[in-house]
Amino acid sequence: MIDLPKICRNTLLVVVLSSITLFGCSNVSEKTEDIPVNSAQSDTLEKVKNGQLEGVLIGIGATKKEVLDKIGNPIESGNSEYGFTVYYDGFDLQFEDYANSIDEVKDTSKVVLMNAEPKTVGMTGKPEEIKKNLGEPSREFMDDTGDNTFILEYENSGNLLRFAFDSKESPVKYVTLRVQ
């Protein structure tokens, strides 16, 4: 005698298991292993997100008071494109205000831009080496408005990290981090 309910139950079980196997193994998968994130990339871009550069003790958004308390008096100072600039060994910081001297800059004036020497931030390579370390930039271009420098830009959380090179084959000339 044929046990019809048992055959139906077994058939249903086979269909359910086959469906789970078939649809549970879809072609859509995360490709995290295809995009390796090295620690240098992760650390550098995380610092940029927070307005900081490796080797610079202060970040974007720090006040004049915080800068002087943490780093001390600058080697040199004066006005520049973005505001009053203070120069230290290996980097400079630009405040949002203009002034004739550091004493005239408000204590609450904030750092809006920093320039650093490549050695200070530990990024001394050619453009391809920088891309290898940090990934593809948000933008790369030849700046023909002045000294024909080659630029790599990385945007992260409202901050812009810029690497300037004399050419596509030369090492980093300087590194800039600024508010967008």
What is the role of each PLM region?
Residues 32-58, 63:
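N-terminal low-complexity, Pro/Thr/Ser-rich intrinsically disordered segments
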Residues 51-58, 112-121, 150:
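Second-shell loop/turn segments in exported
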Residues 22-35:
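Bacterial lipoprotein signal-peptidase II cleavage site
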Residues 39-42, 47, 106-121:
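N-terminal short leaders/motifs
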Residues 2-12:
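Bacterial N-terminal signal peptides that target proteins for export
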Residues 14-21:
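Bacterial N-terminal signal peptides
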Residues 44, 62-107, 121-180:
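A cross-family detector of function-defining hotspots
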